[in-house]
Amino acid sequence: MEIQAALKKLIDRQDLSTEDMTDVMQQIMTGQATPAQIGGFLIALRMKGETIDEITGAARVMRSLATPVSVKGDLTNLVDTCGTGGDGSGLFNVSTAAAFVAAAAGAKVAKHGNRSVSSKTGSADLLETAGVNLSIPPEATARAIEDIGVGFLFAPSHHSAMKHAIGPRKEMGVRTIFNVLGPITNPAGVKKQVIGVFDQSLCRPICEALQRLGSEHVLVVHSDDGLDEFSLSAPTLVVELFKGKITEYRVSPEDVGLESQSMDSLKVNDSEESLTLIKQALDNHALDRTQGRTQRRKGFDDNGRISDADADAHFAQIDAAGQLIAFNAGAAIYAADLAQSLAEGVVLAQDAIGSGLALAKLHELASFTHLLMEDQS
């Protein structure tokens, strides 16, 4: 089907078949459609609402045109934590931090991601701030996943065909089907994922699309307080694909041994603040409460010794960050089939944080990417 004909159908609020959507996406991704046609199509599709058939067809085209990352060895526990972003919460990079915790717990993590579009900091922004070189070839990314347990798949490096849609997307400045496609077009071909989405209505369609695309274990989530993550301050809707069946349920922090609490202190302004909080959370959980407070009280500010109240507030912030990371990492560990339940996954995540291995994985990936580029120069 030609894009003009598809556009007419969408204007009449008619759904496209998987085959029709495949035809149109091929035209968009191979430069056969004009910017005006692309923009009109994306807006008309958004206004009608994307169906499972349309998401599936579009994802198949993006996957077929992606530059692959061929991970060798046992892929039983290969998982991704990439979400849609765009929830507007301003929180630190939770899913990226969770990726390193899952790797420390034994998963192989192919973390797909990009720079920030609407949030304070994207996964690529955070990792670049942490010293990770984003400009490594696909075979090097595969080696990082194999040897370290985690690698970063920088979306622009693997989805070059997206260049044809970048202009219209930026000029329109609204969410389109491409915001949904990113998490379901991982170049490493993962079949196990945790996907946070910006709108609860997307949970079921994305899960069903992934079922058609051959995924094995997937958790698509959106919290009742609007996060594209598991939340500490409200129940989270989970649409889970496992063993060919899809189930829906809600999870509260107490269900997995955590505490419900405010997350206002977990908002950041940029990647520097996000990285600092993540490092503190992953490092602090190797300490107990008393030791952590004792160490912080050795510091001074302009008015003298830091107060107990300030120390307690700082500890509470780091503790909340650690719990939020453990919640989401636990889901990744469960999706990777390293735990029998989400609650068990959270326990394994807490162990990985407490051991210091999660923070070590972050440093290891940064060192690996830079040593690799030095060897090639």
Which role does the model predict for each range below?
Residues 1-2, 10-56, 63-73, 324:
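N-terminal glycine-rich anion-binding loops that anchor highly charged ligand groups
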Residues 49-111:
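Active-site cofactor/substrate anionic-group-binding motifs, chiefly glycine-
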Residues 11, 42-46, 80-85, 332-335:
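Short glycine-rich or small-residue beta-strand-to-loop segments that form or flank ligand, phosphate
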Residues 40, 97-101, 324, 328-331:
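Short amphipathic alpha-helical face segments that pack within enzyme cores
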Residues 13, 31, 83-90, 283:
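Short, glycine-rich nucleotide/cofactor-binding loops
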Residues 9, 64-67, 91, 106, ...:
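Glycine-rich anion-binding loops and their surrounding alpha/beta cores
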Residues 83-88, 113-119, 158, 224-225, ...:
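Acidic, glycine-rich active-site loops and adjacent beta-strand->loop/helix elements
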Residues 19, 42, 92-148:
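A glycine-rich phosphate/pyrophosphate-binding beta-strand-loop-alpha-helix module
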